[in-house]
């Protein structure tokens, strides 16, 4: 049976109409529409929770998607840095806690890149080189684990979209993060990317769809930035239909059903 595609929407007062909640959901909506999916708009997870079946897909944010996965006893997880791809990191990465960093000047002044070890935690990753960079990272009530890495001097970044062991597209995103970057002047090394993919397909528990973010450093190295799961992911200009297929591949793998959009 074909499942439904649930689309998170919001009411736009200016236009007096329901619109997709963000542009990623809009892109996926157009992609699923092209493949003749039945699309059902909704506002809150509570509105669809009881009706939601394994065959269905929801276009929503990470935490909301997880509520639906949990209904079926599924907890999605992809490591940021899979073991088989560690040779491509080009930097040391280790675990620490946010409080231990804020207490130690040697740590908070070192210019390390710090991000929560658990995705849904308080802040997005950033470079910490002074005590004020820690503002907004702490949470006095709880000390939590962070991943710390040596800083990279990044010139350009790309998101490689992988569906069923193939790179579907590679989209630049560095300038979204930092307008001063001239990422278009750089290119990654295609041979390194091919080697990354050879390692990727040797990874036993690999996802059927995900993104592999890569970068080129100012000294010309092509390196792995991190992996991201595909069930709720920034599209960065990926063509609508490929974006929808990527989402479907991962949802069907996670919920153990046939991927109806794998054609």
Where are these regions (language model features)?
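A short, terminal or domain-edge coil/loop segment
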Residues: 95, 260-263
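A long amphipathic alpha-helix within ATP-dependent nucleotide-binding catalytic cores
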Residues: 174-222, 245-261
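Conserved metal-phosphate-binding beta-hairpin within the catalytic cores
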Residues: 164-170, 205-237
